[in-house]
């Protein structure tokens, strides 16, 4: 199927993250020249610039000269202007020689007016430099401008690979002692250092600026994490509220980028007297692609005064390229943006980027990838103020951390939305099948539900056999036929088309359709027949969030202003509909395939042969896999060096391996049959009870700590502490019959942890003890530097103690780069920061899932416990972290468990495949029968077709029985419809005719004449299923040349008030020795080893039981009988 998107040619549709990434890249490439054109027009004609007319998203970008685009990109990335509230130095790495500085740097850093020149690195005074250089000159040693301690701090920070981790550095000028925050970022020419003055009201931070900054956002982070899932609007409302409380701006907005790059204000907190912008949409040009690139590079962007004249940056003339200020916190706003802010009455702003994973998945692949390259810009949190405003860097850093947490929560919402989409697809499938069980294909437009229920649309149509069926808002019949002809002519090789703009897709008659139809999804079902879905223009979907623009206002539409942007967006989107989402196209494609199959002849014999072959392969493969899994499981349990214990459904121990016996001092013979509760410590009783209860319900808890009592020689060592994973044990019918606890002994780890956190004994002797029982331990001081790394951590990670001590724990030791214990992306880094900061604040974390890649790229899964570390006076001096890593044996046991689960899942998938393969020819049979019903038939022919229809409906009913548990437990919901008993018996007998003829059996019907027309209320198809199963079994176990009789004995009972109930005795008698006794037992008692015939008998017996009836099997001399007793209400009063 083809698809079109704004300003892109028609192309084949694809799905997945690769397709989305390609589409995004295409939009960026196409949008950038439009941005460049707009900027060029603004700079070329400031006073006559008409913003509304300049924005035309649908304009042709190919007309923009490449030189204009190149100049535009260079201008944005290489502009040498900064804001005046701070100053900039650019230095060479290593030597710290100045290669550039802002013109206000000499004055701000107090190096103007001194009597002595500042010596350079080589000991000589530098001349020149020009432009207000004073005593600050190109080539001088920048370290001499600051106090020795500050110079040393800058020198140390310059050695960090990721300077973001150590920003800001608190420094003081050498001459006046004036305090600054120094913010470093690395460029090709060296280092760019921003210096922001520390205000008297600020609380100066230490060298651990990043770590300290997180504390400022602790409350906001806790609130975000406590929000219920499934509500992105609430999440956005909360984050803007928290940012406004943190920063104090007049207006804070959450701004989301849509798939076509345009933006929308989805949440807002503002001063009451300000005009609301909530709900406004803005064209993509409002935030150019180059600016979005800068937002990805510099996640927080502050403009303190858009009206303040910018300051020029001077650089060494010997540099080949202009200094890049892309990462500078002081970079000046571009003229177009400054004008935009001024027009909307905003003087200061703070913009924070919100990024999410490209594919919406929290796991981002292996250790050899660069996770940061797989982020995308979801949107922005934008703050505006009506007067100049400066936010200190530590607080901005806290806001950036809050945005990272916000991004994690958004990822969770995206994953939840993906799950809901999958559920939607699963709900759509029965709808599709139901459509085809009716008048295919006309029923999908003439009945309810119809194709408009499949996807969101304004109208739909079916073109079939040169006839049209219309639903909702559609083009006229003549226009639809013209669209079909255009598709056949220009898209003859495609199975369909989807576009949000017929005009841009090239349809010549798009203008005549008006605004009612802009987008279309067309699916070809035959060579000349189509299904159509139509959507109107987007503008009607957009709601004004605030007061509508008053036409009497003298707002100049030529000025750049949010309302002007919104007006421009309305002009653009009235020619375009909402885009068709992937999940919608999947649903349309599924219906297309099923309909196309309905028009093809189906070879029943080939299908039957394929299905039987597949079933045989499935049976053999299943036996081999389950046998291998069982043998491996038994071997592992017997030889495992981790404790494994099993409990039955009554809570009694029925499994106890050697390791469990070793730890507790109790042999298996001593515990088998005893309640598990008797073997656990008092404080673990409720925990174990809850685990058992949930596991027996099928809910398996993981990583739960319990304590077992010890006996005999082990008793003096105290209780055994275990981390337990509960695994529900199931029979072949997926019934939970017990629980298996796979555990890890953490007794020594718990003892060590208690000693560390309470400062008992010589902790260093314990930490550095090479004893394998000591867990992996690492720690950080109050500044965030790694202060502990024990031998177990060395062995686990491959990194030596001397390689990590003194480095930043988050970012350098655990980071997203290869030269560290690499985490799975930025989200993993953010989560670790939250855990450590919570511990530093006194909030301990237990058993937090934690994974990283060791030095050799091997993934390590562990549970992390973080605890504060205090000195003798109780003052927090750092954090201790303990890792619980599952042993090899436990990992193998869990792997075997996963193998068993995978084998079961494979069986389910294979069964689903078989069901689908049966359904496809079944749909063809149903379609053929419906065609026969529409012809002139005799009464006998009509009865044959009716019997065939009942058999087909019974087959569909059985195929839909995905939940056999409901039948076994007696909770199945029965249908109650009026039916004629004679038609049921005809359908039952027809199912036995082939087998009876093959075996030469005589099939005898012995029922009163009134049975044929007797009308009853009940579940017709279930009764038909029961009787046909018993009849087939009777035929299968009858002797050749014998007979099978089918007798019905009705007995009417009066219940009063004109209500009559008919008691029916169905007796199916057959010659021979009868059905084997083992199968008859299986009909009444469920067991794990039953045959498929036994399972069928058992299910039918359960169905009879659900219908408040009973089944017997009576053996007599030379014959045996199924006797089924069940009652049905009469559908009409007996007149006789």
From Swiss-Prot:
Protein name (Swiss-Prot/TrEMBL): Phytochrome
Similarity comment: Belongs to the phytochrome family.
SMART domains listed in its UniProt record: GAF, HATPase_c, HisKA, PAS
Post-translational modification: Contains one covalently linked phytochromobilin chromophore.
InterPro entries, A to Z: GAF, GAF-like_dom_sf, HATPase_C_sf, His_kinase_dom, HisK_dim/P_dom, PAS, PAS-like_dom_sf, PAS_2
Signal peptide: none
UniProt entry keywords in alphabetical sequence: Chromophore, Photoreceptor protein, Receptor, Repeat, Sensory transduction, Transcription, Transcription regulation
Annotated Histidine kinase domain residues: 913-1132
Biased composition regions of type Low complexity, renumbered to the chain: 11-20
Taxonomic placement: Eukaryota, Viridiplantae, Streptophyta, Embryophyta, Tracheophyta
Organism: Picea abies (Norway spruce)
Region of interest (Disordered), ranges: 1-28
């Amino acid at each position: 199927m083809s698809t079109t998107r704004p300003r892109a040619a028609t192309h084949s549709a694809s799905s997945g993250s690769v397709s989305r990434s390609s589409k995004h890249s295409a939009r960026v490439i196409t949008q950038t020249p439009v941005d460049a054109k707009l900027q060029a027009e603004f700079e070329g004609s400031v006073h006559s610039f008409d913003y509304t007319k300049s924005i035309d998203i649908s304009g042709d970008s190919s007309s923009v000269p490449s030189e204009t685009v190149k100049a535009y990109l260079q201008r944005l990335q290489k502009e040498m202007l900064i804001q005046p509230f701070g100053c900039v130095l650019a230095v060479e790495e290593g030597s710290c020689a100045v290669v550039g500085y802002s013109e206000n740097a000499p004055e701000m850093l107090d190096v103007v007016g001194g009597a002595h020149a500042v010596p350079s690195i080589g000991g000589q005074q530098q001349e020149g430099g020009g432009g207000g250089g004073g005593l600050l000159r190109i080539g001088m040693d920048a370290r001499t401008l600051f106090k020795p301690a500050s110079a040393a701090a800058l020198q140390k920070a310059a050695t960090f690979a990721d300077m973001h981790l150590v920003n800001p550095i608190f420094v003081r000028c050498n001459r006046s002692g004036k305090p600054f925050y120094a913010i470093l970022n690395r460029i090709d020419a060296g280092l760019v250092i921003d210096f922001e003055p520390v205000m008297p009201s600020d609380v100066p931070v230490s060298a651990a600026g990043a770590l300290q900054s997180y504390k400022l956002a602790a409350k906001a982070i806790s609130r975000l994490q406590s929000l219920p899932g499934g509500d992105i609007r609430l999440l956005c409302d909360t984050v803007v509220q928290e940012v406004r409380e943190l920063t104090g701006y007049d207006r804070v907005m959450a701004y989301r980028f849509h798939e076509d790059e345009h933006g929308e204000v989805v949440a807002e907190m503002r001063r009451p007297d300000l005009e609301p912008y909530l709900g406004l949409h803005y064209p993509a040009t409002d935030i150019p692609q180059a600016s979005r690139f800068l937002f990805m590079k510099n996640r927080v962007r502050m403009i303190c005064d858009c009206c303040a004249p910018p300051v020029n940056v001077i650089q060494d003339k010997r540099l080949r390229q202009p200094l890049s200020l892309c990462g500078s916190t002081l970079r000046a706003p571009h003229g177009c943006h400054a004008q935009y802010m001024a027009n909307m009455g905003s003087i200061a702003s703070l913009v924070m980027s919100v990024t999410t994973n490209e594919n919406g998945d929290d796991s981002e692949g292996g250790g050899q990838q660069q996770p940061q390259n797989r982020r995308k810009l979801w949107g922005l949190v934008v703050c505006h103020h009506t007067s100049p405003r400066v936010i200190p860097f530590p607080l901005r850093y806290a806001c950036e951390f809050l945005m990272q947490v916000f991004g994690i929560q958004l990822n969770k919402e995206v994953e939840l939305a993906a799950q809901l989409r999958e559920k939607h697809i699963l709900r759509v499938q029965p709808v599709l099948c139901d459509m085809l069980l009716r008048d295919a294909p006309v029923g999908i437009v003439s009945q309810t539900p119809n194709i408009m229920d499949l996807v969101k649309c304004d109208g739909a149509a079916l073109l079939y056999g040169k006839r049209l069926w219309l639903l909702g808002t559609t083009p006229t019949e003549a226009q639809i036929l013209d669209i079909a002809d255009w598709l056949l002519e220009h898209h003859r090789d495609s199975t369909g088309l989807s576009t949000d703009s017929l005009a841009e897709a090239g349809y010549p008659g798009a203008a005549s359709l008006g605004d009612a139809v802009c987008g279309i999804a067309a699916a070809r079902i035959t060579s000349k027949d189509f299904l159509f879905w139509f959507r109107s223009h987007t503008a009607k979907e957009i709601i004004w969030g605030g007061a509508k623009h008053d036409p009497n206002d003298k707002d100049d539409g030529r000025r750049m202003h949010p309302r002007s942007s919104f007006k421009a967006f309305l002009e653009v989107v009235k020619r375009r509909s909402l885009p068709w989402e992937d999940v919608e196209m999947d649903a349309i494609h599924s219906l297309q395939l099923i309909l196309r199959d309905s028009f093809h002849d189906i070879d029943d014999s080939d299908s039957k042969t394929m299905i039987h072959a597949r079933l045989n392969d499935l049976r053999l493969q299943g036996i081999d896999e389950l046998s291998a899994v069982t043998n491996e499981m038994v071997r592992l349990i017997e030889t495992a060096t981790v404790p494994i214990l099993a409990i039955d459904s009554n809570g009694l121990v029925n499994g106890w391996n050697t390791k469990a016996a070793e730890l507790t001092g109790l042999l298996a013979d001593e515990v088998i049959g005893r309640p598990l509760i008797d073997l656990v410590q008092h404080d673990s009783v409720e925990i174990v009870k809850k685990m058992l209860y949930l596991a027996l319900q099928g809910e398996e808890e993981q990583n739960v700590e319990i304590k077992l009592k010890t006996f005999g020689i082990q008793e003096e060592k105290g209780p055994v502490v275990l981390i337990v994973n509960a695994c529900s044990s199931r029979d072949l019918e997926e019934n939970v019959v017990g629980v298996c606890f796979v555990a890890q002994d953490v007794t020594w780890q718990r003892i060590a942890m208690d000693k560390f956190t309470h400062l008992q004994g010589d902790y260093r002797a314990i930490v550095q003890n090479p004893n394998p029982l000591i867990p992996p331990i690492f720690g950080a001081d109050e500044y965030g530097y790694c202060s502990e790394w024990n031998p177990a951590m060395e062995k686990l990670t491959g990194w030596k103690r001397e390689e990590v001590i003194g480095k930043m724990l988050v970012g350098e030791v655990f980071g997203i780069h290869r030269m560290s214990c690499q985490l799975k992306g930025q989200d993993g880094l953010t989560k670790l920061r939250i855990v450590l900061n919570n511990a530093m604040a006194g909030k301990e974390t237990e058993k937090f899932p934690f994974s990283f890649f060791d030095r050799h790229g091997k993934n390590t899964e562990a549970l992390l416990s973080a605890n504060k570390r205090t000195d003798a006076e109780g003052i927090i001096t750092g954090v201790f972290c303990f890792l619980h890593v599952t042993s090899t044996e436990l990992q193998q046991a869990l792997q075997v468990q996963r193998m068993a689960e995978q084998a079961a899942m494979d069986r389910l998938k294979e069964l689903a495949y078989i069901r689908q393969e049966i359904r496809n020819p079944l749909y063809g049979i149903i379609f053929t029968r419906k065609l026969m019903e529409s012809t002139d038939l005799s009464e006998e022919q009509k009865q044959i077709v009716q019997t065939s229809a009942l058999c087909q409906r019974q087959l569909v009913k059985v195929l839909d029985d995905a939940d056999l548990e409901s039948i076994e437990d007696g909770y199945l919901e029965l249908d109650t419809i009026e039916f004629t008993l004679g038609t049921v018996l005809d359908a039952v007998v027809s199912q036995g005719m082939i087998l009876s003829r093959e075996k030469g059996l005589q099939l005898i019907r012995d029922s009163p004449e009134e049975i044929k027309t007797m009308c009853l209320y009940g579940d017709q198809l279930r009764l038909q299923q029961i009787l046909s199963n018993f009849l087939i079994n009777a035929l299968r176990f009858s002797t050749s040349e014998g007979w099978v009789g089918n007798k019905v004995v009705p007995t009417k009972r009066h219940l009063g008030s004109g209500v009559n109930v008919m008691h029916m005795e169905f007796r199916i008698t057959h010659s021979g020795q009868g059905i084997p006794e083992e199968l008859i037992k299986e009909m009444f008692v469920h067991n794990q080893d039953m045959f498929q015939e036994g399972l069928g008998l058992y299910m039918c017996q359960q169905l009879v039981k659900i219908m408040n009836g009973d089944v017997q099997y009576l053996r007599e001399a030379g014959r045996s009988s199924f006797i089924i007793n069940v009652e049905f209400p009469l559908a009409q009063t007996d007149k006789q």
